[in-house]
Amino acid sequence: MYNDKLKICSGPETTGWISEQLMTGKIPVTDIFIDIDNKPDQMEVRLKPSSRSSTRTCTSSSQTEVNYVPLLKKVEDTLTMLVSATSRQNAAIEALENRLSTLESSLKPIQDMGKVISSLNRSCAEMVAKYDLLVMTTGRATSTAAAVDAYWKEHKQPPPGPALYEENALKGKIDDPNSYVPDAVQEAYKNLDSTSTLTEENFGKPYISAKDLKEIMYDHLPGFGTAFHQLVQVICKIGKDNNLLDTIHAEFQASLADGDSPQCALIQITKRVPIFQDVPPPTIHIRSRGDIPRACQKSLRPAPPSPKIDRGWVCLFKMQDGKTLGLKI
């Protein structure tokens, strides 16, 4: 009877009923704990609930695995695509770096042309200054100088037809306080003053200004504010005072043509050009050592009794406290 009930019922009700029957002694304990070897036919009663549970668990696990497999497949495919895209990107970056290196190498000659272009720019500026003055002071003169002067004074500008002036006459008008010369003409004349007319003496040796010579030498020197930059200023100043800028420029270019470094070329100028031999360096008055360019600090030395430029002494810095330091190369 109770076997039939066990087969029909299952779940908590069956468990409670079995417990009650065991407590009251209506069901023998041996009938519940079946000996598998002796009573294989009763395995169905005891294992029936567990077999259902086991089936449900297995089915749930199988469903979970079935659900995860496509997701894992998608993740794997996505990672594969990401790795492939990253590899292509790395290859593209490497190719771009190679192209940039090639482009940089190709542009290096153009960078070296910068110095030549700078020199041409200065030459063109002088040519423009000459042209400005030429237009203002020469041409088909149809009026006298007096008429031109009257027109300038009245209209504050040159007449439409340019008047022909000699350079010396124009210089005399500019120097004469009673004569009126337009500002534009004066400016053009000052710009032209940086050049000189070709003669038998300076033919093939075009005049160069101290500013242009300084810029040319600066273009060859590395860094900024070094002792050699200071030496360039001293050389240009002394060369301008002695009207030997052309000689200094020629000496500098000759040293470079011989393969000397720019620094060596500057030193050769101080030893070969007579105006620098046995000449004391200039004295520069400063407030403190901090006013000296940082690049020159390591080249400062206590000033000797009689320093000379051709012995490597560029200049002397005299501070307010009376201390004097020499710039030595």
Curated annotation (Swiss-Prot):
Gene that produces this protein? VP35
Q: Which family does it belong to?
A: Belongs to the filoviridae polymerase cofactor VP35 family.
Residues with the modification Phosphothreonine, per the entry, are: 195, 199
Subcellular localization is given as: Virion; Host cytoplasm
Task: Output the InterPro entries linked to this UniProt entry.
Answer: Filo_VP35, VP35_IID, VP35_IID_b-sht, VP35_IID_hlx
Record Gene3D superfamilies? Filoviridae VP35, C-terminal inhibitory domain, beta-sheet subdomain, Filoviridae VP35, C-terminal inhibitory domain, helical subdomain
Q: Which CDD domains match?
A: V35-RBD_P-protein-C_like
From the UniProt record, which GO molecular function terms apply? RNA binding
Q: What is this protein called?
A: Polymerase cofactor VP35
Instruction: Give a yes or no for keyword Coiled coil in this entry.
Output: yes
| GO biological process per UniProt | symbiont-mediated suppression of host cytoplasmic pattern recognition receptor signaling pathway via inhibition of IKBKE activity; symbiont-mediated suppression of host cytoplasmic pattern recognition receptor signaling pathway via inhibition of IRF7 activity; symbiont-mediated suppression of host cytoplasmic pattern recognition receptor signaling pathway via inhibition of TBK1 activity; symbiont-mediated suppression of host toll-like receptor signaling pathway
Give residue ranges for domain VP35 IID.
204-329
Could you tell me what this protein does? Plays an essential role in viral RNA synthesis and also a role in suppressing innate immune signaling. Acts as a polymerase cofactor in the RNA polymerase transcription and replication complexes. Serves as nucleoprotein/NP monomer chaperone prior to the formation of the large oligomeric RNA-bound complexes. Regulates RNA synthesis by modulating NP-RNA interactions and interacting with DYNLL1. VP35-NP interaction controls the switch between RNA-bound NP and free NP and thus the switch between genome replication and genome packaging into the nucleocapsid.
